[in-house]
Amino acid sequence: LPSDATPVLDVTGKELDSRLSYRIISTFWGALGGDVYLGKSPNSDAPCANGIFRYNSDVGPSGTPVRFIGSSSHFGQGIFENELLNIQFAISTSKLCVSYTIWKVGDYDASLGTMLLETGGTIGQADSSWFKIVKSSQLGYNLLYCPVTSSSDDQFCSKVGVVHQNGKRRLALVNENPLDVLFQEV
């Protein structure tokens, strides 16, 4: 990480800590709000919940807590903007479902015209599981999917946003309107 690395902050202004769990919450309230949660993917034959969704409103259930696992763990416990990282749902689970907690980008969904976020990723490997947190041009932060392991400035990253799937808001790769989020310690 460069010496001018900027730490990611939670809603109270504290730096994110890889040892703690956070809810990914919306920067908006009411019908535009809603926390991120782990749920069952439509038409999935996976034995465990494997879809990454956002509730339809901020009134109601809280989201599923996550941990951020930075690729630069030798820099301490902080999580920094533009750092390659893995995202893992921080939940108790059966042995069968352990691999269904780590975020990744799934295959292209032709009916929705995009790639959906799901679980089943691998921590620390150069597959479909690398993400970044960047400052939003609006309020809060955006999540990016960054499939290349290099941290060069010309790295190709895609924005994470929301698409509608069977009446639910599913996290997916988008060209416009990335999801603006904040992080709330659990």
Swiss-Prot record:
GO terms for cellular component: vacuole. CDD domains: beta-trefoil_STI_CPI-like. Tubers. Its main location: other. The record marks 67-68 as: Reactive bond for trypsin. GO terms for molecular function: serine-type endopeptidase inhibitor activity. It comes from the Eukaryota. It holds the Pfam family Kunitz_legume. Probably synthesized as a single-chain precursor which is cleaved to form chain A and chain B. It is found in: Vacuole. The keyword Disulfide bond applies. Induction: By infection with Phytophthora infestans. Signal peptide: none annotated. Disulfide bonds join 48-97, 146-157. The record marks 115-116 as: Reactive bond for chymotrypsin or HLE. Potent inhibitor of serine proteases (chymotrypsin and trypsin). Inhibits tightly human leukocyte elastase (HLE). Does not inhibit papain, pepsin nor cathepsin D (cysteine and aspartic proteases). Protects the plant by inhibiting proteases of invading organisms, decreasing both hyphal growth and zoospores germination of Phytophthora infestans. Heterodimer of chains A and B; disulfide-linked. Double-headed inhibitor able to form triple complexes with target proteases, by binding simultaneously one molecule of trypsin and one molecule of chymotrypsin. Belongs to the protease inhibitor I3 (leguminous Kunitz-type inhibitor) family. The serine protease inhibitor PSPI-21 comprises two protein species with pI 5.2 and 6.3, denoted as PSPI-21-5.2 and PSPI-21-6.3. They may be encoded by two alleles at the same gene locus. This is Serine protease inhibitor 2. It comes from Solanum tuberosum.
